[in-house]
Amino acid sequence: MSTKNFRVSDGDWICPDKKCGNVNFARRTSCNRCGREKTTEAKMMKAGGTEIGKTLAEKSRGLFSANDWQCKTCSNVNWARRSECNMCNTPKYAKLEERTGYGGGFNERENVEYIEREESDGEYDEFGRKKKKYRGKAVGPASILKEVEDKESEGEEEDEDEDLSKYKLDEDEDEDDADLSKYNLDASEEEDSNKKKSNRRSRSKSRSSHSRSSSRSSSPSSSRSRSRSRSRSSSSSQSRSHSGSREHSRSRGSKSRSSSRSHRGSSSPRKRSYSSSSSSPERDRKRSRSRPSSPAVRKKRRTRSRSPERHHRSSSGSTHSGSRSSSKKK
């Protein structure tokens, strides 16, 4: 059969023998070349396109021939010598794939392949990488490794031979023999009464000491209040003496003026005697009112009591001079 006139149709199959690879018609049950029977391993052929034929070739007016084929996927018309489509690369004769209906979803085939991984204590893992605990250690000779192992074994033996005194179980007997006087529940009532009396005495002592300290602390406060009351009384007496002296000076001035106006023609010794007689009871009143409480306050009051006398003398002198001038004019 010539290759030019060979046409693949749906259902044709390829011989499963790799050395043969002959394409047989769909109606054959055995290979036409090697005689091997058709099995399930034989792959079915599928035509990727169909020939256009003479009618379409005549309509193309010499552009295509009857052997040219049209692709089934993109419907492009390809030359007969092409084994693949010029547009979508679909093969002219393709192997028919099994239609299983599997789309590749999760657990679609129901036969999931589990990879069994064995965890070993080796130096390398399943991917051939060195484990972390072995990365920092330098590989030394076998003698050094043996020494390290011997040291580790000796350390374990020492740990086993440690002092086990803290794990002794015979300590309970020693505790039973200890002094149990503090746990005596049959103590007499006299001891309890003595303890109560001692507690009461200590409390009374603490209260008495507290009252003494409070009385001591209150004494300076009382002395302060007394000193404040004294200072206030002295200040009030000073203010009273000031007001009395001012009133006395005012009364003197008014009396002198009235006497000068009414008795211009009278003599001066009468005026002096009148002023001295009028001022003597007022001075006695001053002295009775302002009795100093301390020597410093007495000095201050003496100086203040002298000042109105000077004022009175000056006023009397002025009145005397006025009376003299009036007598001369007469």
UniProtKB/Swiss-Prot annotation:
Statement: the UniProt record of this protein carries the keyword Transport: no
Tissue localization of expression: Expressed in kidney; more specifically in renal juxtaglomerular (JG) cells.
List of residues that carry Phosphoserine: S9, S120, S153, S181, S188, S193
Comp. bias (Basic residues): 196-210, 251-273, 297-314
SUPFAM superfamilies: Ran binding protein zinc finger-like
GO BP annotations listed: mRNA processing; RNA splicing
ZnF RanBP2-type span: 9-40, 65-94
Function per UniProt: Splice factor required for alternative splicing of TRA2B/SFRS10 transcripts. Binds to ssRNA containing the consensus sequence 5'-AGGUAA-3'. May interfere with constitutive 5'-splice site selection.
Oligomeric and partner information: Interacts with the C-terminal half of SNRP70/U1-70K, the Arg/Ser-rich domain of AKAP17A as well as with U2AF1 and CLK1.
Protein name: Zinc finger Ran-binding domain-containing protein 2
Species: Rattus norvegicus
